């Protein structure tokens, strides 16, 4: 990306905030966050969270995340069998995680997340099934299931659409058209529509506030 593209990109994100801005806002009142399936590059890095714990089953990803000092503490564990005390964290998040699980496993995990959270639960996942193969020698990266907005709505979540129109994305979620830089901007602009109509979006952003 040249200097002109960098300048345009900077101005664009100032005019059209990406989904990380919504995550930052949702976590702004949280002092502790549990990041399930944190991976090697969690978006928590861009949030002002005093204390966070990352959990992942892929040890190389944990080690890489440790080097970046994204979380305060890390645990290698299978989130499908994880056991924690109720209300252990202000927020429990699963960013790009449940699509790597069977539907049954995902539906079993969500109520656990609600029990572990004091204030809110946040989940993001592709809208529908998106093919994705293993990366970084991590078989856990393979996509297994697809989810739609209505499923989260039935579970009491508020759902918004992120990353613009799904129709603009191709294999593994990359921009379908060229030049990718231009279509990334166009995709960002369409988020003004998909935010309110998540069924059209590439990514679903679901959140539920706990009422204690």
Predicted region positions:
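N-terminal, positively charged/glycine-rich alpha-helical extensions of SAM-dependent methyltransferases
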Residues: 1-4
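S-adenosyl-L-methionine-dependent methyltransferase catalytic module, highlighting the catalytic core
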Residues: 6-9, 14-17, 80, 102-212
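Conserved SAM-binding loop
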Residues: 22-130, 206
């Amino acid at each position: 990306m040249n200097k002109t593209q960098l300048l345009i990109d900077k101005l664009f994100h100032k005019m059209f905030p990406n989904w990380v801005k919504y995550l930052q806002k949702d976590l702004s009142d949280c002092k502790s966050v549990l990041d399930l399936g944190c991976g090697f590059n969690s978006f928590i890095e861009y949030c002002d969270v005093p204390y966070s714990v990352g959990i992942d089953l892929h040890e190389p990803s944990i080690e890489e995340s440790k080097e970046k000092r994204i979380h305060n503490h890390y645990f290698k564990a299978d989130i499908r069998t994880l056991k924690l005390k109720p209300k252990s964290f202000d927020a429990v998040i699963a960013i790009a995680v449940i699509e790597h699980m069977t539907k049954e496993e995902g539906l079993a995990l969500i109520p656990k997340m609600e029990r572990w959270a004091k204030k809110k639960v946040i989940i993001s996942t592709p809208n529908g099934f998106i093919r994705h193969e293993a990366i970084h020698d991590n078989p856990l990266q393979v996509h297994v299931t697809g989810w739609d907005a209505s499923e989260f709505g039935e579970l009491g979540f508020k759902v918004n659409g992120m990353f613009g129109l799904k129709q603009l994305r191709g294999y593994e979620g990359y921009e379908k058209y060229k030049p990718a830089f231009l279509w990334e901007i166009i995709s960002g602009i369409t988020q003004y529509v998909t935010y309110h109509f998540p069924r059209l979006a590439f990514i679903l952003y679901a959140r539920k506030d706990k009422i204690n």
